[in-house]
């Protein structure tokens, strides 16, 4: 291709590309509502949803905004995922262990006592097939699962004596969800 032909074709391509730009900017703004399972007082955890909201708005030039609501402002905190499933809100920020009562499989997507640490959980999720398994599971609830943080392993307890055998657990109190105490 000679120089004149190249310049001609490049010019035509430039005009066509410039003509399509207004169509992109003419798209309607997207506004979502996010229900959190956490109160504003838990600023580290609740703040994570606010940070995601700000980053999405910044990355899209304000064309996609997510309004974050604390637990109880739209639905009770433990019903955030149900609100997404039912179409009450567009998305939620929650912890899967709140939904053990629906299915114990939710345990694999979050921190639980004696479970994986943060690095192990992330490795499984992002490199060990965990994301695909969790998405398949969440599809049953009409929800798409996106991990958005990791609080690390949940402690089973702090004890005055060393735990060496199962018998050492007898009579100890644990920090675990009420609905799953009997299973541990």
Q: Predicted segment positions?
A:
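Immediate post-signal peptide segment of exported/extracytoplasmic ligand-binding proteins
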Residues: 21-37, 50, 57-65, 139, ...
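Short, polar/charged alpha-helical segment
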Residues: 42-67, 129, 181-184
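Extracytoplasmic "Venus flytrap"
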Residues: 33-50, 71-75
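Short helix-initiation/N-cap motifs at beta->coil->alpha
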Residues: 69-82, 162, 177-180
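Contiguous mixed-secondary-structure segments that line small-molecule binding/active-site clefts
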Residues: 53-54, 85, 95-184
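N-terminal export signals
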Residues: 5-26
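Alpha-to-beta junction loops
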Residues: 62-64, 80-94, 173-174
């Amino acid at each position: 291709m000679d120089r004149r032909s190249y310049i001609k074709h490049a010019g035509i391509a430039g005009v066509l590309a410039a003509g399509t730009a207004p169509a992109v900017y003419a798209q309607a703004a997207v506004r979502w509502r996010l229900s959190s399972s956490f109160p504003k007082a838990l600023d580290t955890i609740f703040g994570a949803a606010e940070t995601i909201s700000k980053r999405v708005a910044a990355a899209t030039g304000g064309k996609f905004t997510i309004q974050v609501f604390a637990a109880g402002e739209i639905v009770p905190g433990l019903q955030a995922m149900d609100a997404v499933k039912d179409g009450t809100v567009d998305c939620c920020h929650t912890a899967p262990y709140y939904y053990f009562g629906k299915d114990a499989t939710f345990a694999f997507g979050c921190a639980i006592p004696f479970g994986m640490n943060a690095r192990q959980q992330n490795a499984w999720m992002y490199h060990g097939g965990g994301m695909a398994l969790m998405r398949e599971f969440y599809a049953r609830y009409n929800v798409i699962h996106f991990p958005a943080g990791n609080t690390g392993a949940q402690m089973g307890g702090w004890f005055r004596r060393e735990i060496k055998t199962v018998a050492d657990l007898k009579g100890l109190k644990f920090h675990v969800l009420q609905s799953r105490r009997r299973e541990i």
